A protein has these predicted regions:
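Cys-nucleophile CN-hydrolase/nitrilase-fold catalytic domain and related Cys-dependent amidase chemistry
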Residues: 23-113, 181-199, 203
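CN hydrolase (nitrilase-like) catalytic-core segments centered on the catalytic cysteine
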Residues: 63-83, 148, 154-242
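C-terminal beta-strand edge segments of enzyme domains
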Residues: 131-132, 203-206, 212-325
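Short amphipathic alpha-helices and their capping/turn segments at secondary-structure boundaries
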Residues: 1-5, 31-44, 161-167
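Active-site catalytic loop in hydrolytic enzyme cores
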Residues: 90-177, 181-199, 219, 259
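Short beta-strand segments enriched in small/hydrophobic residues
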Residues: 4-20
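Acidic/histidine-rich helix-loop elements
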Residues: 19-28, 124-128
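Short loop/turn motifs at secondary-structure junctions
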Residues: 12, 43-44, 148, 170
Length: 325
């Protein structure tokens, strides 16, 4: 457990939005990632966040040395890094989408396996049933010199229960590296992503970092850094978004209560909080039991326990259910 008196009061975070390479060119991501680490460190960043599956391996060979090179760069520039890759699962042709947290000594501190992959049955369908993305079964927080990091991946940010649990475990910032899609249609959900990032930050009184790969054909990214009070940084094009996270202000927001501002408004404008302070204390867990009850239409993330070939039946069931609604 980190003693908050020993934490740095501020930390500069760099969220990277790279022009990502896939397939036969995926090997190029490693050198590019190291260059981004240099750029971020030169800008004063202490923590660099890459997107889901970046620098890999993700779509190419499962061992390409990318993670080793990123660890070396993290050690050389004395920065923490969130990197992404695909890891082999326990069964043949199974994989985990993994968020790897590296400290400033270049050592891997955590390997978070995405607990809610984006419809693993759909992934199996798209890959002809040859490859299966399996879910992890553990949520993770990691203590760093600048605060406690809650690890997520991509659209898990849209699942409020995950963010709330990480907050209850003491997370100061939630880091959700995103994947990305090909083509211009993704721009339609860019603002939705940023709205969700701000919402998770405000409702949990945490900082939120989102990143995205820009694949060939991508038009706009969704990379952003949000505080409980406002959007601190965002980027549409390739590059880095940088923001300073203030832990002292975060502690002040968490320790105060909303009514204080109503009854006695602060004299200085900069002391007026742009969120609902004390929000994390306003909870009625005795009313939340339905959240953990089995639901008939809930997605079966562990269909592989019934046999990997059952993905077809699971997919058909979901598709038919969607048509019925």
């Amino acid at each position: 457990m980190t003693d908050r008196d020993d934490l740095r009061r501020t930390v500069r975070v760099a969220a990277v939005q790279p022009p990502a390479f896939t397939g036969a060119e995926e090997y190029k991501n490693a050198a590019q990632a190291c260059a981004f680490i240099d750029e971020a460190a030169d800008a004063g960043a202490e923590y660099v966040v890459f997107p889901e599956g970046y620098p890999g391996p993700y779509s190419g060979p499962m061992e390409n040395g990318a993670l080793t090179r990123v660890c070396q760069a993290a050690r050389a520039r004395r920065v923490w890094v969130s990197a992404g890759r695909l890891e082999r699962g326990p069964l043949p042709e199974t994989y985990h989408i993994t968020h790897v947290l590296i400290d400033d000594r270049g050592e891997v501190r955590a390997r978070y396996r995405r607990v809610q992959p984006n419809h693993p049955v759909f992934n199996a369908y798209l890959m002809g049933g040859r490859h299966h993305v399996l879910p992890g079964d553990e949520l993770m927080t990691v203590d760093a010199p600048f605060g406690r990091i809650g690890l997520l991946i991509c659209s898990e940010l849209f699942v409020p229960e995950l963010s709330r649990i990480l907050m209850l475990r003491g997370a100061d910032l939630l880091v959700a590296p995103g994947g990305g899609v090909h083509g211009p249609t993704h721009t339609r959900v860019q603002e939705t992503w940023r709205c969700v990032a701000r919402t998770r930050a405000a409702e949990n009184l945490v900082y939120v970092v989102v990143t995205q790969n820009l694949f060939a054909g991508s038009h706009k990214g969704r990379t952003c850094i949000a505080s409980p009070e406002k959007m601190l940084a965002q980027r549409d094009d390739p590059g880095i978004a940088v923001a300073d996270l203030d832990l002292a202000r975060l502690d002040a927001i968490r320790s105060r209560f909303y009514d204080e501002q109503i009854l006695s408004p602060p004299a200085r404008e900069e002391d007026v909080l742009g969120c609902r302070p004390g929000q994390s204390h306003d909870r009625r867990p005795e009313l939340y039991g339905e959240l953990v009850q089995p639901q008939p239409d809930a997605f079966d993330y562990h269909y592989e326990r019934r046999g990997l070939t059952t993905w077809r039946a699971e997919y058909d069931k979901i598709r038919e259910g969607a048509h019925d609604r």
